[in-house]
Amino acid sequence: MNDLKYISGDLVEAWIGINTGSLVAEVVGYNPLYQEYILTNWYIEETRGVISITEDRITPISLTPKILEKNGWKLSHGFYWSPNEEGAAVGLSSQTGYVWKAYIGRHPLRSNINSVSDLQHLLFGLGLNLEMEV
């Protein structure tokens, strides 16, 4: 069995085609027979329902301070703190604003978080809400 790069709920940028270009979409499944991810978003739902595309047409979305703030993360003492309702103090810090380190409280948890889907996987692994907007 292959390890999947993306899981259900991940937000990604997908190259749809010449006329449409690329769109932000949500991974809703994986078809192992054709090795394609199944994606949807408002545009895809209106026109086709869902689409299946190969991994080479998917690009991770860079995790930025703007995206964190849009999702309720608050900057305090050099860390962005998670708005989760479960009470876990998940914090992110970055020297560059694009490569992040995760902490539980002040204890290191994971480094090299580069994309929205990386953060979603971390939150999923902690049993926290992984829904995000970009």
Set out the residue ranges of the language-model regions.
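Intrinsically disordered, low-complexity, charged/polar segments
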Residues: 45-74, 110-129
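Acidic, low-complexity, intrinsically disordered interaction modules
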Residues: 31-34, 38-52, 77-110
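Short glycine-rich, low-complexity/disordered patches
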Residues: 76-82, 129-134
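Short beta-strand-centered aromatic/proline hotspots
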Residues: 19-37
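Short alpha-helix capping/helix-loop boundary micro-motifs
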Residues: 1-2
